[in-house]
């Protein structure tokens, strides 16, 4: 069977990790990377050495020339175009483009990739107007005539599978989410200007920083039955990877905490295996580093006030889990052709 050929625009945190996922997949082939700000030798260095996920150990990575990287024997074209419509995706056969710059996140901007020969674009961020899909929740609603999609956010990917299970089994009347979230690249190493978000400009390594997030509201887009029932906020904390969702909900149908645990466990071992996880051990954030699942329910951490009011806790590697889902979404899109 022919491999799915993908290109990556933007070789930042998600771009590089999507590349790692793709290069470890038998059915996906990375054919090109575009980044106007990074030379090929620096790309090689950034790919090989990763503070969080460790050194790349699968095969040698080296520069063939200024426009080609070698991953083992595999050649990957490198482009340096600032304007997406100028990237010659068609010349290397890249059918699917992962848009991971964080810049071209609406349909119109992302559509520029189609002019260069790409067939489909997956935006690795929430989008104001592109249809959003969360694998394990609503990917089956994807139709093959949709050319531009959003993989939502890492937090929505954690929250939505859990919310779906709880709503399907017990019904959610309303809920509030807090994500305790690791540092990301948009934050500051020392206090610096951040005119749109004053608190967000404070030193990331020294502060717990309250922040806004659209992740809970976005669940209403991928699960319309929950539209208007969830909202939430974020605390940015001084860790480099792995985040945790605290979902506090009022249930329609009364349930014991043990019944809730059993429902989540059944789905984690059944239809959502590989997407939703379930743990009863006494784990902490670093134990989930490199976990490819979207959401790992922490059975011991949750609490119930009564049969209708519960707090549920679910972990996620906000980098690796999310990057794995980007590739899974591409696989699903390809299967509908």
UniProtKB/Swiss-Prot annotation:
It is found in: Cytoplasm. It is an enzyme of class 1 (oxidoreductase). Transmembrane segments: none annotated. The gene is GAPC3. Pathway: Carbohydrate degradation; glycolysis; pyruvate from D-glyceraldehyde 3-phosphate: step 1/5. Its main location: cytoplasm. This is Glyceraldehyde-3-phosphate dehydrogenase 3, cytosolic. It comes from Zea mays. GO terms for cellular component: cytosol; protein-containing complex. Coiled coil: none annotated.
């Amino acid at each position: 069977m022919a491999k799915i050929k993908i290109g990556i625009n933007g070789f930042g945190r998600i771009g590089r990790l999507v590349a790692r996922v793709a290069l470890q997949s038998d059915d996906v082939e990375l054919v090109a990377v575009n980044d106007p700000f990074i030379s090929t030798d620096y790309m090689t260095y950034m790919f090989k050495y990763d503070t969080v996920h460790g050194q790349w150990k699968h095969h040698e990575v080296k520069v063939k020339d200024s426009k080609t990287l070698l991953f083992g024997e595999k050649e990957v074209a490198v482009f340096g175009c600032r304007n997406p419509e100028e990237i010659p995706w068609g010349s290397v056969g890249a059918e699917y483009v992962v848009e991971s710059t964080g810049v071209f996140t609406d349909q119109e901007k992302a559509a520029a990739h189609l002019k260069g020969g790409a067939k489909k674009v997956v935006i690795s961020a929430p989008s104001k107007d592109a249809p959003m899909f969360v694998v394990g929740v609503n990917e089956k609603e994807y139709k093959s005539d949709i050319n531009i999609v959003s993989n939502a956010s890492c937090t929505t990917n954690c929250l939505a599978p859990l919310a779906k299970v709880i709503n399907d089994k017990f019904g959610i009347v309303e809920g509030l989410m807090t994500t305790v979230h690791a540092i990301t690249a948009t934050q500051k190493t020392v206090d610096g200007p951040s005119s749109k978000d004053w608190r967000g400009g404070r030193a990331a390594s020294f502060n717990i920083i309250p922040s806004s997030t659209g992740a809970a509201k976005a669940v209403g887009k991928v699960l319309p039955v929950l539209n208007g029932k969830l909202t939430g906020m974020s605390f940015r904390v001084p860790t480099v990877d792995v985040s945790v969702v605290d979902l506090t909900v009022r249930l329609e149908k009364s349930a014991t905490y043990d019944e809730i645990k059993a429902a989540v466990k059944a789905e984690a071992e059944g239809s959502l295996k590989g997407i939703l996880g379930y743990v009863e051990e006494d784990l902490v954030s670093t134990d989930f580093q490199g976990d490819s699942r979207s959401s790992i329910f922490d059975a011991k951490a949750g609490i119930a006030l009564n049969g209708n009011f519960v707090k549920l806790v679910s972990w996620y590697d906000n980098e690796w889990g999310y990057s794995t889902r980007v590739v899974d979404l591409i696989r699903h899109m390809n299967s509908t052709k």
